[in-house]
Amino acid sequence: MARKRANAAVLAQDHLGIKRFFALDEAAYRDGPLPGRIKELLGLAASLVLRCDDCVDYHLIQCVEAGWSEAEIVDALNVGLVVGGSIVIPHLRHAVKTLGELRQGGDSTST
């Protein structure tokens, strides 16, 4: 919910470039030659490599909602770890903690 409010505040700035980027981001995760649910796994791995915990949280929520199993999500996190190296380990810890909370039905991510 906090993410939606924050995005609304950003979009309220009424800047064409920002609006276009947000539209591009949304469109990138829609079904295309690759299904949207696979794109969420890609987004998760990329977010881990980029060390963006907010992004990791968002993509974890999307992956859980898309029906990916914990093993499949952890496999995607492994790809992010291999690509990103040891510097992403703190973010991997965060991701595993968040995934556990999501699986228990809680949402401490405030997204």
Short names for language-model regions:
Residues 26, 43, 60-64, 77-78:
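Amphipathic alpha-helical segments within well-ordered protein domains
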Residues 52-55:
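Short cysteine clusters
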